[in-house]
């Protein structure tokens, strides 16, 4: 990726940093007594919420498991703030443990609000630049056109002679329609069949292709964002940003051309 990089994606995620924090001036001090008090307070709230949810959905409430999950989430929050929060803001935090439980001072709250605004502005500006670069190459409708692959799950990437074929996890449109017929016939009568037979990209064939960069196995990865660039030879480079449980990674494929395969014939696309 040249513009929509891993750093760009992480900054976009940071635009939500601390959005659920509450101002509590107790967070201005660092003491074991305060931390334990806040811990018990937040743990009690979490357990009560989980207990109510289990009762509503008729599930077994496992307090020991919920306590463990609470502690694991707290560790995750601490690591996130420690590694992602700007140092200038982190230095204002008296006790990271209390911050990870959801409390901060007014000064930290305001600083994070400004940082979130900067993240949002910068990521949107970069997204606009990526689109302008695509348009400047005459590639507005190239690759997938108006059909986004965002959040599509990759099933496989396999070599077929000189080509590469990438398959996506897609629901069969007829299966979707049968499900609606069985479970919501009134909706089908109201809307008709056509809205449920919408086309989706089920596979992409990269013609005369080579992989220039593949940081992880793409199987079961979520496709996030992509860029397309013309090559000097007249072909294309497809840059993709994908996500799996162990993080975001990049895939770059150079090819002569691409062919899209649909869940319904392309000629039938409205």
Regions found by a protein language model. Give the residues of each.
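Surface-exposed, interaction-prone regions used to assemble/regulate multi-protein complexes
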Residues: 1-270
């Amino acid at each position: 990726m040249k513009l929509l990089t891993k750093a760009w994606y992480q900054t976009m995620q940071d635009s939500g940093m601390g959005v659920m924090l509450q101002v509590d001036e107790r967070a201005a001090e660092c003491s074991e007594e305060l931390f334990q008090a806040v811990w018990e307070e937040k743990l009690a709230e979490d357990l009560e919420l989980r207990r109510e949810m289990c009762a509503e959905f008729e599930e077994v409430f496992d307090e020991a498991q919920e306590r463990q999950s609470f502690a694991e989430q707290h560790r995750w929050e601490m690591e996130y703030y420690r590694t992602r929060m700007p140092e200038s803001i982190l230095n204002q935090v008296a006790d990271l443990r209390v911050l990870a439980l959801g409390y901060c001072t007014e000064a930290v709250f305001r600083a994070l609000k400004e940082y979130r605004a900067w993240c949002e502005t910068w990521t949107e500006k970069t997204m606009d630049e990526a689109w302008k670069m695509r348009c400047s190459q005459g590639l507005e409708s190239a690759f997938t056109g108006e059909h986004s692959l965002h959040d599509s799950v990759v099933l496989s990437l396999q070599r077929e002679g000189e080509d590469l074929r990438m398959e996506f996890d897609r629901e069969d449109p007829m299966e979707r329609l049968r499900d609606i017929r069985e479970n919501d016939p009134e909706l089908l009568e109201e809307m008709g069949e056509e809205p449920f037979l919408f086309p989706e990209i089920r596979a992409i064939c990269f013609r005369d292709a080579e992989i220039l960069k593949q940081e992880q196995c793409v199987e079961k990865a979520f496709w996030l964002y992509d860029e397309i660039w013309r090559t000097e030879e007249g072909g294309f480079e497809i840059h993709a940003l994908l996500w799996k449980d162990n993080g975001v990674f990049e895939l770059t494929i150079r090819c002569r051309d691409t062919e899209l395969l649909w869940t319904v014939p392309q000629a039938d696309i409205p």
